[in-house]
């Protein structure tokens, strides 16, 4: 494509719609995240049949993505600080396509596992960079729901994966299930090619004129000097950062505790056991056919999407903390009910397990699901935002890996009922953590949130001097 044609297309994206177009393309990284994590739930039934996998081998196939995602999260934040989120997301799109294609043609379990590790690398890069990109192009009054587009896209990707699983279940077409992700990867990469870097990254790199032009485009304001000065002032109040050791500084530590705590609790409350193993869970509950279990899983996925949309509309109205506390309370109740439903599994009562799963997923979708990704994109100082979010995402993926590697084994040793009771206890701990440690960020600019942490640090210093 000629430079003139590229410039014309970029110019066509000017105006009020530009920020929403940019957010939609960036959020495709979330859709691929959701698809590539969710698709294995239905495909695994047929992969096990073809390759004769043991329980441990099944856990490794599922968790290959999570190992790659952990590695991607480790490098993703620092890479964005150095090269910019847009460039990193372009590379991410290419890795998504390569990983999906390699998974679809894998001739053996080892090749499939390696291919899923590659896919996981892309997922880890997307999970660290898409929320930050969205938070930095969004206006403060709409940042909550725009960043929540990422989680919405994840849930849509999961539903698309479940529908694809159901479509190919009749022919046991697990290769088609895995290979379908190549198409959205191409769209994601094409969209990111035409999007700009974020103003904050550009100003940090000294590209002030480019940052001014980008802000004028995404804010539809002739005068964006006030916002530019606010970003500059935020940078001026910090020493050089962006290194891992900066995360241990006293003024950063409270935000780090919030981010890492939410990262771990989002996973140890068990949500991805439902995403990865839902058909197997439902077969344990009494569903006899693979197709029936997969179809019921689609219903769970639709609830996930619907409640994520509800969260998007409420997050900038009700605030982050109220949604978090109410949603986690719902998770505690539904996990308890789910544990009880597995005490007495039968075909007649199988739908009780489905209803409990839907209630659990609905509660997660208005709380830990979107709000974790939103908060870790908001709460960190600008200079370390990339590396800090990368660290939080790394903890998130490492926790996900541990939970997913142990779920089937826990069910074998303890039973499904006790396993879900265990996740319920973790949810109680997460509610207490949210109540005592998580601040409200609704309606604040990123610079105001940063100032809040500085003021809190100074107040603690003064208290310690008395």
Where are these regions (language model features)?
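Alpha-helical transmembrane bundle of multi-pass membrane proteins
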Residues: 1-210, 214-216, 236-466
